[in-house]
């Protein structure tokens, strides 16, 4: 895929900014850096923009320049609202972005964990993952969370991971760098958070069931909050 468009969503007044070491692991996506400011009840966008607009714009420009310095074309924008999930969805749909990055504290991009729920759009997801520079990559591991009430959950998960790994190999990822793990649990967010320990990036895929807050809200946000691991959501 030529230059996929990645939405980088940061929140003001204290945005989490991707580190230079982390950005070195990306291979030529286009970045749309969007700063979101949460408006309190009765607070107007005009008042906040008048008071802090220049400061926030300067910060966003500096973040975009950090991407540019690593060879990533970047644009930036500042939005205001009371619902960051709704604002994010609106931008995603308006600009038809290919992926969403929620920045965290990782200083490198050597170990990537991919949550794999099913094999839907596997080839597209694999091609999107090609934005990760393989020269920097040490491991790209796969995890599936099986339903404990499903007697065939684990075996089904193993099949999903095997097929996903095969697709990654087909697009050029080294087979020796791919590990597969099936976890069992009813709390998917918790299981993925536990699995994300020690990784530099957590990758989630959007599925039909996951549209809206399930992925663009609580699960991705939960993992980021618990582990401070950047989350990349593939569409």
Language-model segments: which ranges?
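Helix-enriched interaction subdomains in cytosolic or periplasmic regions
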Residues: 1-5, 58-103
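Small/aliphatic-rich secondary-structure junction motif
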Residues: 1-47, 111-155, 166-174, 178, ...
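Short, ordered loop/turn segments at secondary-structure junctions
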Residues: 37-41, 79-81, 104-106, 144-148, ...
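N-terminal positively charged helical leader segments and presequences
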Residues: 40-58, 64-69
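Charged helix-capping and loop-helix junction motifs
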Residues: 53, 158-162, 216-220
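Short beta->alpha junction loops
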Residues: 77-82, 179-186
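Gly/Ser-rich helix-loop-strand patches that form or flank binding pockets
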Residues: 81-133, 196-235
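A short, acidic, amphipathic alpha-helical segment used as a generic capping/interface helix at domain edges
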Residues: 164-167, 184-196
